[in-house]
Amino acid sequence: LLGLVPKVHIPNYGEFYELRHFTPGNAEAEDVWVPEEGEDGDYINFGTNLLFTCEELPGLAVAAEICEAVWVPNPPSIGHALAGATVIVNCSASDETTGKNLYRESLIGGQSARLVCGYIYANAGEGESSQDLVFGGHNIIAENGTILAESARFTSETIYAELDIARLVGERRRMTTFQTNVSSPYMEVGFHLKKEETELSRYV
């Protein structure tokens, strides 16, 4: 377990009533004690301002935002990208309403273009609907404005795609208007990824 990223934007409009049960988490990263069975436990990085950097692949830096965060006027992913994140991941529970899938696709694609990043969006799906909300499992992988992979709704489909991290880093370097300007402190958390020869599904 590398870190815990809390939800900071709690919707309380339309069909959402999350403020009845939850309060927003903190952005600033800190160490929190997470107990385990018996007397064991460990300190875990907790907060939204966490940047997970790969030791073996320079340029691969991952940050997370949760669900509603990508829909707000100033998403956390903006700060993540300016702090150096090249891949944004989002665990979401976005319900299905008329036309919302098209809006969702446009939103994720647009955010990946604006931030010159890869954006991996995983949505609630099979077995998670209730009498109040229906979740279609609409998953999306986007890169710099291009939808690389997208699941069909109401299926248990696994999607995958290759993200060209070197291209993203190069594109950011080329754009004189894309400057890293971190307004709040981030905690870097290193992780390891084994390099393996992989057959690609796209030209990179």
Predicted regions and their residues:
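Enzyme catalytic cores with a strong preference for nitrogen-chemistry domains
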Residues: 1-204
